[in-house]
Amino acid sequence: MSSKEIQVRQNQELQLKIQYAARECYNTAEKLNYWVWGLCILSFVIGFLPNESGSVLLSVGSILCDVLAFLLNIALVKKNSNAAMLRKHFDDCVLKIGCEECSTSRETFELVEKICAKHPQKFATQIKNSGTDSPPGVKDWYSFSKKYEGSEAQFECQRMNAWWDSKLSQWRLGLAITSTVILMGAVFYLAPIKGIWTIIVCLVGIMLKLIERAREYILYYQLSYKISGVMEIIRLNQPPDEKALVVLQDLINQRRS
């Protein structure tokens, strides 16, 4: 195993398709997340519309928003799960950490082909472009500043994965904090007008989403702490030990899901 072998293997047609499909799943999950938040907020706003007439319709509208948000959240989780599975499969096939052989199941292959066939022009651009091109693509996913050999090459890829995932999560955390601050401001402003119990009822969807997101971040930072610890141990014990790389890869896969 060397950095050169990884560069060749990652640009094989099937691996490029897998990376493209994983990116599409993550992007779709992100869009669904915005829709879920939007529906939760809309449900909250509906609860404060004038209800002298048509109060039943307003209540039904609020409930429909919550139900639709729930269904979209299920689809979001499925997309995110597929993306994490595809990224794991890509790393298994390209890095071969803890596994010498890698085979793509029929179910995974059909999923990848279906996603790639949906937008053929976009797919063609993505597999042709690298991350530094415009628009950024999936070619040359792992780029090396120098030549690495053996387990050092595998560890360098894991280091890049840990950095990318951390950067993405910081952006999401900032968005969640901003949303929470805006929500708290709205609650304090509206509570004297509508009453605290009305506020609580209208906030059910948003509160469930915030609890879900808080749970995700707690798990994320627990895994990040473990990842940092294992990476530090590997850095202090060169060349990287195969068993330590397997443990690190498992933690990275858990954090993606």
Show which residues each predicted segment covers.
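Membrane-proximal, non-transmembrane alpha-helical segments
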Residues: I6-Q19, T132-A176
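Short, non-transmembrane cytosolic segments of multipass membrane proteins
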Residues: M1-E5, S103-E149
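Sequence termini and other peripheral, non-core segments
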Residues: M1-L49, S53, L86-H89
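Solvent-exposed, non-transmembrane helices and loops of integral membrane proteins
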Residues: D91-Q126, M231-S257
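Membrane-interface amphipathic/juxtamembrane segments adjacent to transmembrane helices
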Residues: R9-L14, F70-I115
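Cytosolic/matrix-facing juxtamembrane and C-terminal tails of multi-pass cellular membrane proteins
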Residues: S2-K17, A21, A214-S257
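Charged, amphipathic alpha-helical oligomerization/scaffolding segments
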Residues: M85, H89-D92, K96, Q154-C157, ...
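Alpha-helical transmembrane segments and their immediate juxtamembrane boundary regions
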Residues: Y26-K79, Q170-K226
